[in-house]
A protein has these predicted regions:
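Conserved beta-alpha-beta core of the PfkB/ribokinase-like small-molecule kinase fold
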Residues: 115-169
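Short beta-strand/turn micro-motifs composed of small residues
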Residues: 6, 45-47, 143
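Short, acidic/turn-prone active-site loops that include or flank metal/cofactor-
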Residues: 26-29, 70-72, 143-147
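Histidine-anchored nucleotide/phosphate-binding helix
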Residues: 26-36, 130-131
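Short secondary-structure boundary/capping elements
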Residues: 23-27, 98-102, 121-122, 147-150
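Active-site metal-binding loops of divalent metal-dependent hydrolases
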Residues: 6-8, 27
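Conserved N-terminal subdomain of the carbohydrate kinase-like
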Residues: 10-22, 37-117, 131-136
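Extreme N-terminal starter segment of soluble prokaryotic enzymes
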Residues: 1-3
Length: 169
């Protein structure tokens, strides 16, 4: 089994020609949807009560959502803009909301996962969560500038708990 932990979000994305508000986003969301073409991944994430049911239905079609928590409060939100080439991104706003105090746990049926992907998320949560798995054959984490600039020491420690690292600017 593949388990993916990280953010499920509502994103506002600005391009030179369009603004998309509160669209389905989050690193764990995108990783889970991509993986679902090959396996049925388990998702560990948190959303707020404001998370649209239509997005929940999209995820539930091909992803095991036993690890998706719905908490009082607002879903994590990200806002960013892209330049004319769509290759340069500027983060405009990051509101952690329910993600800020989330204490993730691994559902029993996920603990035997052979593969774990710690998608872009709080490195302290990632370090804690990876310890809950019984027999991981391969683990990988992802991080971005937000965590590197706000929790650099934790990011470095997180790298030591996984087999591979992906860094995005």
């Amino acid at each position: 089994m593949l388990t993916i932990f990280g953010s499920t979000a509502l994103d506002t994305i600005r391009t030179p020609t369009r603004v998309l508000k509160d669209v389905l986003g989050g690193a764990a969301t995108f990783a889970s949807i991509s993986a679902s073409f090959f396996v049925k991944p388990g998702l560990i994430a948190v959303v707020g009560k404001d998370f649209p049911k239509k997005y929940h239905k999209i995820l539930a079609k091909r992803i095991d959502l036993n690890g998706l928590s719905i908490k009082d409060g607002k879903t994590f939100r990200y806002s960013g803009s892209y330049d004319n080439t769509l290759s340069l991104r500027t983060t405009l706003r990051t509101d952690l909301n329910v993600l800020k105090d989330f204490k993730p746990t691994v559902p029993e049926n996920y603990k035997k996962s052979s593969f774990v992907y710690l998608a872009n998320n709080d490195p302290d949560q990632n370090k804690s969560l990876i310890k809950e798995f019984d027999n991981v054959k391969f683990s990988m984490c992802d991080t971005i500038d937000f965590w590197i600039s706000t929790k650099r020491a934790s990011v470095i420690k997180m790298f030591k708990t996984v087999d591979a690292v992906v860094i995005n600017d």
